[in-house]
């Protein structure tokens, strides 16, 4: 696993966006051979999306032959709802780049048959061979996508009940009213994420420090699903200084020395 310890969340966003652009451009996607990108929602990736839009507008990347798969979507929330992940993605990213609408894939949380929708999503991913790069964030309790604590590390796309911690955290998007937050979501599984060729997690802020510690220094266990990244051949964690507060000093120093070139690229 690579850990890239930066100073600020802005540096994290810049590094992540540039890494995505480099991967797309190196791949040289075409209509018959698209680059497949996994994407998250939430507050952490917002600046990364803004930076990707800036790089697109500067002519440094095209998303015309990029296929995207989002991590998750609430159950029962209309697509047009201001807090649906459909709305989030179009408002904060898709409406500002040259991605083709047919290349956008987001789970349908309003379908009558959730199991069938989850199977369809898995098959759609498989139809492209694999996701080349999956970017994600992490919850305070270490969940990735909506794979809450005690989720199976071998899980696939499915419906999940959201924990009280997640409902409280997400209530900030629903007028701070926990009763307005959907109780269920469709989400890719931990194994779905690990199937990607590369997984890049963005971890920022003091409140994510325990999650980062579990990811980097802890044992692999289902109570901290982020720890499953240790099993991946090409896992990357990009973090800011506040998120490192629970890591051992020698751990931070080790990766700081190891990733000197990556760190200097955003200074």
Curated annotation (Swiss-Prot):
One of its GO terms (cellular component) is cytoplasm. It is an enzyme of class 3 (hydrolase). One of its GO terms (molecular function) is glucosamine-6-phosphate deaminase activity. The active site is at residues 72, 141, 143, 148. The record marks 151, 158, 160-161, 254 as: Part of the allosteric site. Pathway: Amino-sugar metabolism; N-acetylneuraminate degradation; D-fructose 6-phosphate from N-acetylneuraminate: step 5/5. It comes from the Bacteria. Its EC number is 3.5.99.6. Keywords: Allosteric enzyme, Carbohydrate metabolism, Hydrolase. It catalyses: alpha-D-glucosamine 6-phosphate + H2O = beta-D-fructose 6-phosphate + NH4(+). GO terms for biological process: carbohydrate metabolic process; glucosamine catabolic process; N-acetylglucosamine catabolic process; N-acetylneuraminate catabolic process. CDD domains: GlcN6P_deaminase. Pfam families: Glucosamine_iso (PF01182). Allosterically activated by N-acetylglucosamine 6-phosphate (GlcNAc6P). Homohexamer. Catalyzes the reversible isomerization-deamination of glucosamine 6-phosphate (GlcN6P) to form fructose 6-phosphate (Fru6P) and ammonium ion. Belongs to the glucosamine/galactosamine-6-phosphate isomerase family. NagB subfamily. This is Glucosamine-6-phosphate deaminase. It comes from Actinobacillus pleuropneumoniae serotype 5b (strain L20). The gene is nagB.
